[in-house]
């Protein structure tokens, strides 16, 4: 199995995992930008955490997030919600991977790629990659059979 290959087995605690991964893999180059240097990854995460809309959309989201690198030989990037930590695999420095892992911190759930996670990821993509990227990912999720809760857009606080 290639180091970045996604495991396709169905996990009964996370039945959408393989669908989410397949959908994301099919549009990876179309969602957000490629982050060329590690400092670009750090700056992207800092910009998200500093954006007032982040807390407006997700009032309980962590603001103090630990970001670290994983070696290229690691199988995948990973989020550790109980530690507010994101580990990004070398070679996976792109906006969608960062937003995917951040979504795990924002929406920790018994079902890691469940409907709330998908809605969170879509909201982050819309805010930080733009509407076209959001529409692309949303339609790709639908085409792959991925279910999502309602996507939060912003609270009334942000409307002033």
Model-derived segments and spans:
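Metalloprotease/metallohydrolase-associated module, dominated by Zn2+-dependent proteases
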Residues: 1-89, 93, 109-160
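Active-site recognition of the HExxH zinc-binding catalytic motif
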Residues: 96-108
């Amino acid at each position: 199995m290639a180091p970045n290959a996604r495991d396709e087995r169905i996990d009964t605690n996370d039945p959408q995992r393989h669908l989410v991964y397949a959908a994301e893999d099919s549009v990876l180059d179309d969602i957000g930008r490629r982050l060329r240097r590690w400092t670009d990854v750090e700056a992207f995460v800092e910009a998200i955490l500093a954006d007032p809309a982040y807390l407006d959309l997700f009032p309980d989201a962590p603001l103090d997030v630990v970001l670290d690198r994983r070696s290229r030989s690691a199988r995948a990037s990973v989020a550790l919600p109980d530690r507010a930590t994101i580990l990004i695999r070398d070679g996976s420095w792109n906006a969608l991977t960062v937003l995917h892992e951040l979504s795990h911190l924002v929406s920790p759930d018994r079902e890691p790629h469940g409907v709330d996670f998908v809605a969170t990821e879509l909201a982050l993509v819309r805010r930080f990659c733009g509407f076209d990227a959001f529409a692309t990912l949303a339609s790709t999720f639908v085409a792959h059979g991925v279910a999502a809760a309602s996507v939060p857009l912003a609270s009334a606080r942000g409307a002033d």
